[in-house]
């Protein structure tokens, strides 16, 4: 389909293509990137800005939202915030947005994009809240286009042992993917200077003797999962970031 426009045009709207082959956002992005690479012999720099309409549960009218990530010399373009009073549906919106952008739950009538779904490679959901509404798929159940980095599983809150196990898996993958320097720079910024010895203990595989607080454990584990899983054109959805937010992590 990437190399032959006739085949693409003949099958692009077929149910099997839309519901299976291109269901995940990463698959749709790969198709369009392949078409561009075959034509131009280089990767295209993407603008993942998008507009959508969201109909919250029990709401009569849809809400129009715009997310601008276009590069600008004067205004930062990497962060957008959703602000509203308690009970207005912010958490539900982020949950639905994660599913719609990644293709995790297939079609979703609650969120309608203006035009095509944005070319996002991977959606990463983070929450330190025990009430977050994100899909909790992990491990073998997860799909490439979606990663959950929160404190819960489908069966409840993660234990300290489970958090540490997830951390070890992510850290091992960081080493394998040659991302250690990036990880070390980020964790060094997160930790206070008097706690930098934690880094040395992690590098020495001395986990049993690490004297980290529960907050440090959660923060380092989450940042490690992020570094492990992030890709180009990833979108990180952070619900209630003020919970457990460490000053150095801002």
Placement of each model-derived feature along the sequence:
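Extended helical coiled-coil dimerization/tether regions that scaffold
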Residues: 4-73, 117-118, 130-217, 223-232
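Switch/communication elements of ASCE P-loop NTPase nucleotide-binding domains
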Residues: 57-110, 203-250
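Hydrophobic/aromatic beta-strand patches that form the interior of the parallel beta-sheet core
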Residues: 80-82, 124-126, 149
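Flexible phosphate/Mg2+-sensing switch loops adjacent to catalytic phosphate-binding sites
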Residues: 103-137
């Amino acid at each position: 389909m990437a190399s032959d426009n006739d085949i693409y045009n003949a099958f692009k709207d077929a149910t099997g293509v839309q519901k299976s082959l291109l269901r995940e956002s990463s698959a749709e992005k790969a198709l369009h990137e392949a078409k561009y690479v075959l034509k131009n012999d280089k990767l295209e720099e993407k603008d993942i800005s998008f507009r959508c309409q969201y109909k919250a549960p029990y709401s009569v009218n849809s809400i129009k939202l715009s997310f601008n990530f276009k590069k600008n010399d004067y205004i930062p373009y990497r962060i957008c915030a959703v602000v509203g009073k308690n009970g207005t549906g912010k958490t539900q919106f982020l949950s639905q947005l994660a599913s719609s952008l990644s293709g995790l739950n297939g079609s979703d009538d609650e969120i309608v994009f203006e035009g095509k779904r944005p070319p996002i490679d991977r959606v990463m959901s983070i929450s330190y809240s025990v009430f977050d509404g994100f899909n909790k798929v992990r491990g073998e159940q997860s799909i490439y286009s979606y990663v959950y980095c929160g404190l819960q599983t489908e069966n409840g809150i993660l234990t300290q042992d489970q958090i540490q196990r997830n951390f070890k898996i992510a850290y091992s993958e960081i080493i394998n993917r040659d991302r250690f320097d990036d990880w070390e720079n980020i964790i060094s910024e997160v930790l206070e200077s008097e706690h930098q010895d934690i880094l040395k203990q992690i590098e020495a595989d001395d986990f049993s003797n690490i004297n980290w607080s529960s907050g440090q454990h959660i923060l380092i584990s989450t940042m490690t999962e992020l570094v492990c899983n992030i890709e180009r054109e990833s979108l990180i959805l952070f619900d209630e970031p003020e919970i457990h937010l460490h000053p150095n992590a801002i």
